[in-house]
Amino acid sequence: MRLKHFTVEKDGFCGLFSPSERNRNAAIIVLEDGHPDSYIVKTAMKWLNRSGVSAMGIGPEKYMKGVHNWPLENVENAVKLLRSQGYDKVGVIGSSFGSNMALSAAVRIPEITLTIALTPNDWVYWGIFNDKLDGTSERPADGESAFSWRGEPLPYMPAPYKHPDYWNMFKEEGKQRGDMLASLNLHDLAEKGHPLTEDIRIPVEKINGYLILAGAKDDVMWNTCRGISRMQKKIEESECNCNLKVLVYEHCTHLIFPESMVKLLLPGFLIDLILPHLYSETKGFAKECRKSRIDLDEHIQSTINEWVKS
């Protein structure tokens, strides 16, 4: 996979690009809450190339050590560059925090005509640091939104805890549930502690083109199905131009990736062994999780093909 590197200083965004030999008209941007030079982003890019489209990975520079007041203009600049190189169709895809990035960008950049949000929530996230302070993997960026636009921070849902209680909540809930990590209670507390006002909700009704929202009922990181349901209702009650596809599964937890991408990440037998150690909810449901990933894969592939031909 040939990769071209981009920097904020030179290009207006931090990213990697891998063109497809099969299609120089459509490109999909992978959004990730870490530096794009990661195994999972590069695997997603390889998977997109094999799906017949060019792929770009975008994320914050390493020095940011997280996503806090991250300018969504990074995505806008990448879209402009792709279109200047002949890519008439530009899409975005994100999972977990990356889905918040994808949705928040797509509602502000009309040139994005395919948005794939895996395990999304419907409100703008608080800013986060991944700087390993005091041995924590994540902590809230106090007083900071995850994103900014035109120099202004987006209104956001405040974190219910500060450091170090925030990360301790992750570990404690994971221990109670038998998972490596869990934060369902933390996110529920965030909603209970702050009104879900319209300004912090992502205005998904402004998204153009194709939109896929996918999640699982056994997700213990946050209640993605609740967020998906609210977004679906918002879209159906508006004069939205998007072609919405909602995919909700009984089993697949927070790691809801297309099956063909999972096989690039890990050998098939390994994912069945590893998942129960990450999320106890998958114990006894390996076949059901795989069936969900296969179904998701088929829907995404068919949507990409339809989008490319449209």
Where do the protein language model's features map onto the residues?
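N-terminal cap/lid segment of alpha/beta-hydrolase-fold proteins
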Residues: 1-26, 292
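Short amphipathic alpha-helix adjacent to the substrate-entry channel of hydrolases
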Residues: 39-57
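Gly/Ala-rich beta-loop-alpha elbow adjacent to hydrolase catalytic centers
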Residues: 94-98, 102
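Short beta-strand/loop motif that positions the catalytic acidic residue
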Residues: 207, 213-215
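Catalytic active-site module of serine/aspartate enzymes centered on a nucleophile-bearing elbow/loop
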Residues: 260-310
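Accessory cap/linker subdomain of secreted extracellular hydrolases
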Residues: 116-203
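Conserved alpha/beta-hydrolase "acid-adjacent" motif
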Residues: 220-230, 257
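Catalytic nucleophile-loop/oxyanion-hole region of alpha/beta-hydrolase
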Residues: 58-91
